[in-house]
Amino acid sequence: AMEGVTLGVPAIALSFAGGELKADPALLTDQIPVVAKLLEHLTALKMPRDTLLNVNMPARKASEIRGVRLTRLGRRVYSDSLMKMQDPRKREIYWIGGGSASWSGAADSDFRAVEDGYISVTPLTLDLTHLKMLDEAKLWWTEP
């Protein structure tokens, strides 16, 4: 989705979240009508330039989904682990934080919504600039 936005194409990232980090085909099939209705609504929206929607579906049957929440981006926190592995070409690689993950974030975060049985919809922008700090940092710098 981020690549699409960089090319000027409105984009939606849709993920199956929560529970085991593997897709259950029966659950995905059950959620098709919910996803179709949600996408019908979301694709009708006019999104600002450089914006994408990050949608996370809870690992529940469609009948158990409690609704949709507009959310803020939470933060996934991985355990402090370093695993030495090999890639498919037999090159040595390191996987950082490959253990179990937890999350942190406010009550209005995407993780909280999904954990509580809601679909989370988080508007994201590609510009990660901390604008307030940028303005403050201009005071730090003087030309040599």
Where are these regions (language model features)?
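Internal, conserved structured core segments that host functional sites
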Residues: 1-19
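Mid-sequence acidic-hydrophobic segments that form the walls
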Residues: 7, 41, 45
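Short, surface-exposed recognition loops or helix-turn segments adjacent to catalytic cores
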Residues: 14-23, 48-54
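A short secondary-structure junction signal
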Residues: 16, 23-26, 30, 64-68
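C-terminal accessory domains and tails appended to enzymatic cores
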Residues: 45-48, 52-54, 58-144
